[in-house]
Amino acid sequence: MVRATNAVASHRRKKRLFKLAKGFVGDRKNHLRLTSGAVMRAMAYNYAHRKQKKRDFRSLWIMRLNAAARINGISYSKFIYGLKKAQCELDRKVLADMAIRDPGSFAAIVGFAKEALA
């Protein structure tokens, strides 16, 4: 009796794995055993860095806000505290974008925060 290998499913599985390994260099792109480990590791890094990206962007926004706030004569922490006291609902992403694209409006918001602190 002939041995059944289920060739269609195994070929599809390998094809899916090699498709995920597109762009890999050396044997990692076309040897099944090496490709499998490389793809698993890549997916693990992908998962971790999707979480890391959120932290990275928040720290970038804070750096930009700190620089822009200091140009307007106030520290970042006092600026955020003033906005909280003034019940301003703008988040750091919007504020950082405003600081870069529209410095005049950002200066007005800094003045708003300074008034709340006084």
Curated annotation (Swiss-Prot):
Described by its record, this protein's role is as follows:
Binds directly to 23S ribosomal RNA and is necessary for the in vitro assembly process of the 50S ribosomal subunit. It is not involved in the protein synthesizing functions of that subunit.
Q: Which family does it belong to?
A: Belongs to the bacterial ribosomal protein bL20 family.
Q: Which GO terms describe its biological process?
A: ribosomal large subunit assembly; translation
The primary gene name is: rplT
| PROSITE patterns assigned to the protein according to its UniProt record, in alphabetical order | RIBOSOMAL_L20 (PS00937)
Judging by the UniProt lineage, the source's domain of life is Bacteria
Matching entries from InterPro entries are given as: Ribosomal_bL20, RIBOSOMAL_L20_CS, Ribosomal_protein_bL20_C
Q: Name one GO molecular function term.
A: structural constituent of ribosome
Gene Ontology cellular-component terms for this entry are: ribonucleoprotein complex; ribosome
Q: What is this protein called?
A: Large ribosomal subunit protein bL20
Q: Which CDD domains match?
A: Ribosomal_L20
Q: Which residues form a coiled coil?
A: none
Does the record carry Ribosomal protein as a key word? yes
Q: Which UniProt keywords apply?
A: Ribonucleoprotein, Ribosomal protein, RNA-binding, rRNA-binding
